[in-house]
Amino acid sequence: MVYSYTEKKRIRKDFGKRPQVLDVPYLLSIQLDSFQKFIEQDPEGQYGLEAAFRSVFPIQSYSGNSELQYVSYRLGEPVFDVKECQIRGVTYSAPLRVKLRLVIYEREAPEGTVKDIKEQEVYMGEIPLMTDNGTFVINGTERVIVSQLHRSPGVFFDSDKGKTHSSGKVLYNARIIPYRGSWLDFEFDPKDNLFVRIDRRRKLPATIILRALDYTTEQILDLFFEKVVFEIRDNKLQMELIPERLRGETASFDIEANGKIYVEKGRRITARHIRQLEKDEIKHIEVPVEYIAGKVAAKDYVDASTGELICPANMELSLDLLAKLSQSGHKRIETLFTNDLDHGPYISETVRVDPTTDRLSALVEIYRMMRPGEPPTREAAESLFENLFFSEDRYDLSAVGRMKFNRSLLRDEIEGSGILSKADIIDVMKKLIDIRNGKGEVDDIDHLGNRRIRSVGEMAENQFRVGLVRVERAVKERLSLGDLDTLMPQDMINAKPISAAVKEFFGSSQLSQFMDQNNPLSEITHKRRISALGPGGLTRERAGFEVRDVHPTHYGRVCPIETPEGPNIGLINSLSVYAQTNEYGFLETPYRKVTDGVVTDEIHYLSAIEEGNYVIAQANTNLTEEGRFADDLVTCRSKGESSLFSADQVDYMDVSTQQVVSVGASLIPFLEHDDANRALMGANMQRQAVPTLRADKPLVGTGMERAVAVDSGVTAVAKRGGIVQYVDASRIVIKVNEDEMYPGEAGIDIYNLTKYTRSNQNTCINQMPCVSLNEPVERGDVLADGPSTDLGELALGQNMRVAFMPWNGYNFEDSILVSERVVQEDRFTTIHIQELACVSRDTKLGPEEITADIPNVGEAALSKLDESGIVYIGAEVTGGDILVGKVTPKGETQLTPEEKLLRAIFGEKASDVKDSSLRVPNGVSGTVIDVQVFTRDGVEKDKRALEIEEMQLKQAKKDLSEELQILEAGLFSRIRAVLIAGGVEAEKLDKLPRDRWLELGLTDEEKQNQLEQLAEQYDELKHEFEKKLEAKRRKITQGDDLAPGVLKIVKVYLAVKRQIQPGDKMAGRHGNKGVISKINPIEDMPYDENGTPVDIVLNPLGVPSRMNIGQILETHLGMAAKGIGDKINAMLKRQEEVAKLREFIQKAYDLGQDVRQKVDLNTFSDDEVLRLAENLRKGMPLATPVFDGAKEAEIKELLQLGDLPTSGQITLFDGRTGEQFERPVTVGYMYMLKLNHLVDDKMHARSTGSYSLVTQQPLGGKAQFGGQRFGEMEVWALEAYGAAYTLQEMLTVKSDDVNGRTKMYKNIVDGNHQMEPGMPESFNVLLKEIRSLGINIELEDE
């Protein structure tokens, strides 16, 4: 492998054995590609805004003499960039401007004569833009639009599996689901009649739809039945014979022809009989007259002479009717062919229950069902039916729907119209009847070929279309009303409904979610989430077991592991690592093509529909050198089943072993040794890990860490290669390589880093450079680490030395015993940033004022405020401290004579205001790290606001001028090169001031041209700088757009440092979670022979029953990694020769059986080897990919190389007594996470507080400062113990006895510890409720 200079700093040893055929794709592409499709101009008009505009425009007036046409659209530039939007609390969006054309036609002239055309660009609201990381900033907070898994449009055939009817009869149904429009359902009832429902309304006989489509009874029967023809010859009845139709029936008479008896009466007709009849080519047989009785006529029979209808179609024939038919000259009678086996009489029966006879009555029946209570007219009924399924405005199957529809009906072409046709409806009914007759199968609705993904772009487009349709009505009215000569497109379009629809979707849709920003993994997982809930999806209550279950088609598309526990299990899923969506929105996964038994590197993406036809081998199948299968029989998947196939039957092979799982699960080493339930918890808990103060890469990883860290966007990644020219904590400057520069640019890339900002979950986002001055970097290298990343690798937790042993009951039931050393070294110390806001409003009594002059507050409380009444940066504050002083005017109250006197003596004291300052919430303490003041336009800024403004201006100017200097330097170095090449002497040139260089003239014309070009660039650079500075200044000084009635907002940011403490929740990556029970002194912890104490003691009993053995293997491998690190560390301390160091490290990298990773340290310089060794001191990072990890033998080899016992167990000594424990203990290094369930956030106590209004009981929950509920079962417990007084106290004074609790408080204050219980308020509520039922109930005083 070739490593870049940055990648050589630390190389993770990989145990993977399967070759990496396909790199992990960009993990956020599902979001970015979808949104890109939405906003980019699509000339085809298939997707995005373009499609929405084309589907609604042109809008014609009712009279048809004017129309509004759509020409094109463009998106403007956003006013603020992403960071500014987050600070100001506004939406990151761009204005949408649409060019419309108003065409007015001549009224009297022939059609299509244009009278006037006006074109104008119209503003149509703001469209939120996606940031580079796939999120949206809505009102200053980052949100993610989760993709939705919904039922694909098309036709589905299903059955109720015998659950509807008591007899257990299976009822089949078909459902046509459009992308938008009415659903059409066909269903059988227990009597085998076929019914239809529109939009799940009342059911009607299915033939009504056919009649409404203008079919007669005869035509209907003709469509669905084959015919049996009888002929009357010489008063004998003959039947045209098709032998195959007799199969399985019992002969009710002798079947004979030409004097030969083929089947005797009462015998069953078998395949042998049929073969004989066919062989002898028997076309007619004579049947007894009774045989025709009970058959059904296939068409109307009319008496030719009188015109009288003798026998209508679908009537049962009897012997009398036969005689009548014979008399009136009908010698050939057609009947319907039905039997009990595979030609049921369903449609014929349905026609009998159908009350309608012609098209009009059918339309009226449909109208009555859709609009009950309205009087039907012919026009209304016709237009309603037309609009239901045959109007492009109201009904659209979409391209996907049409494709699925045609595939389901086995048609050849997969494209077609978006509306239904007669043939469509009839084909669906025919297929449903075939399924009822036993031909064909019902669909599996949980198959991923029947469920598709709706991503951001598509959902935004739908919302936008909704907005446009609302505008369309208004435009139509305007066109009809107005004076068209003066109208402009702008006067007709109101942007409000459009922007409201879009805003509503991004702001409050169920699928627009507050981004989970605990750490980079939780961000990535949130963006790759797939939800079956949401508008147009399932609901938690309705979803059954089948929908939630893992389906064979999930393989490689949706992760079988990562899904929430609880009510949403299986409804919210995660995209697998390599999965992507195809043009129709179905999930597809990559496979390697197998040609002639050789596995090629050609990659094909297959959707679940296509995959069903192939035989697919697993990724871990053994291959020979040439790429053939090593074994004759290979385990493969085909048609949803897994079995053995011979090697020449295989069509495809999996790309990678981690193809099955999602990003979260692919980060769990030794996943293959964990029980699925625990793996699920492990994957979910990694997302809750809080970024620690110093990130620490996992010693045992899976090799996915780098991909996650880079793709999540929390790190700064080099856009182009070059040399690090400047680096400090807040910016990195790269001088770009010559070959990567655009012609005529300065070739400088500047990366500004994010410092100490707050995430959505109040964790700290901070970037730190990880490159040094003059280092070479390549494109894609990580320049700066973000939260939870270490040298460009995801690092969610810390490597801890763990021992599996009980320790005095402190690790009973999943508790965790932690050494004090962990606290001292700040291993799990985290920084949390809280934002507290103070809003000053305009009230009826006057404006609230932010000031340091607060009534009745001592000097001490104001000590941390400046003269504007706002806390200064760097102040350390605790609960109850004032952060922003604010007073609110209160109404004049009647003054007591004493107050009047005092006010007369001491002058006007501010009694007409009350203190409403922003204080630090109880239980919170920290350091103020930032203050921001937002002032409404037109309100005078206070001193602090002006100071902040000035500081921001200074900073902006400094940033821009530094940027300018860097760019100038780059430019002048190029100018100097041109001048020297043009013949100017270097010494003379250096004596001249730089700005005079451009005045020099060169004789060489080409060089002079270059010089002039550079001079132009220089001018442009300066001009650009002035422009940027002016724009920045305008943004900083302009007033803020605040909510109505708000004058000022002051936001204070507090940073809180939280050390780990008892009650915090910790976990490993294998679902092994626990709560810290005790922080133990270092000297009491168990230690080994070298005197090294362990950091954490875990309970060994937590492993066997939970079957997550991965944690033990991780512990052993971690120990080996650390052992090798220790040896390297010792060699570095002894200052061994580089050659020896290189040899040892090379040995470690080469270890293992046929691993795919080849690291050749001979290509590294001595410096690079030393730097690599320096980074391996604390342990050699290892990767064991999912399902392709380290084997037991390899772990033992590695342990031997690190001079450690191969059992992975060592002798420990008790820290308190110094005695040896009686048996060796498993000790090693495990990667532990601190989860965002901190005891500080949960700890809560209440004395008195707020009460519920009706019941007068204390509220519940920490947010309401509520009490602990003493519930029904707790009352039973006290009753069982007969603790009457305790119980009385609980049910009265501690709960809802209003007088009692006030008295009790008073008594406590007076030092009299007595209580007088009274009547609980909830009893009064009960009395009132009984009285409201009209029962008078009173308490009698005894």
UniProtKB/Swiss-Prot annotation:
Domain of life: Bacteria
Role played: DNA-dependent RNA polymerase catalyzes the transcription of DNA into RNA using the four ribonucleoside triphosphates as substrates.
PANTHER family on file: DNA-DIRECTED RNA POLYMERASE I SUBUNIT 2 (PTHR20856)
InterPro entries found in the cross-reference section: DNA-dir_RNA_pol_bsu_ext_1_sf, DNA-dir_RNA_pol_bsu_external_1, DNA-dir_RNA_pol_su2, DNA-dir_RNAP_su2_dom, DNA-dir_RNAP_su2_hyb_sf, RNA_pol_bsu_bac, RNA_pol_bsu_CS, RNA_pol_bsu_protrusion
Gene3D superfamilies the UniProt entry points to: 2.40.50.100, 2.40.50.150, 3.90.1100.10, DNA-directed RNA polymerase, beta subunit, external 1 domain, DNA-directed RNA polymerase, subunit 2, domain 6, RNA polymerase alpha subunit dimerisation domain, RNA polymerase Rpb2, domain 2
E.C. no: 2.7.7.6
Claim: Nucleotidyltransferase is one of the keywords in the record: yes
Annotated keywords: DNA-directed RNA polymerase, Nucleotidyltransferase, Transcription, Transferase
Catalysed reactions, semicolon-separated: RNA(n) + a ribonucleoside 5'-triphosphate = RNA(n+1) + diphosphate
Range of residues in the leader sequence: none
tRNA processing found in the keyword field: no
Name this protein carries in UniProt: DNA-directed RNA polymerase subunit beta
